[in-house]
Amino acid sequence: DRVGGAIAEIAGEAFELGPIAQGPGKIAKVTAKVRILDPRVTREVGELITFGIRIPLEIDMVVDLRIDKPKFMVFGEISLRATAQAAEPLLLILDVEKPRPSDISIHVTSKSLRAEVVRIVGGVDAEIKRFIAAHVAGEIDSPASKKAKIIDVAEQVAESWGT
């Protein structure tokens, strides 16, 4: 639970991107509203304690082409790995690997044939993965994230014992 809470802090909740100029001559302007859902964490105990992390997300995206504004709905999941390292006195430090675009799976839908053509010709799926990977990598390095990756076990034991 503590690791899941730390990962949720690192992942954040919702954010907006854009408008970001894309395509030939940077003619297209992309905006997106991203919702981060509750992460699912599975623990694997071996020589090291590692965690498989799956962070579901939903994105409402608009590509403004000046003559048309196709809208897309994206459902996806970010797959991360983390390793827990013990530190003195009673700290648990999470080392979260930064995602690559290949660690992100998405399903993109739209309501028009024109939007589907824009999606295919413009390589929209690959761009979405690239932007998400870059954003999450930035979040992993953020000051708030660095703080969230340190779990004070002694403090939590004291709280549970009421001392």
Write out the residue ranges for each language-model feature.
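Hydrophobic-cavity lipid-handling domains and compact docking modules
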Residues: D1-I104
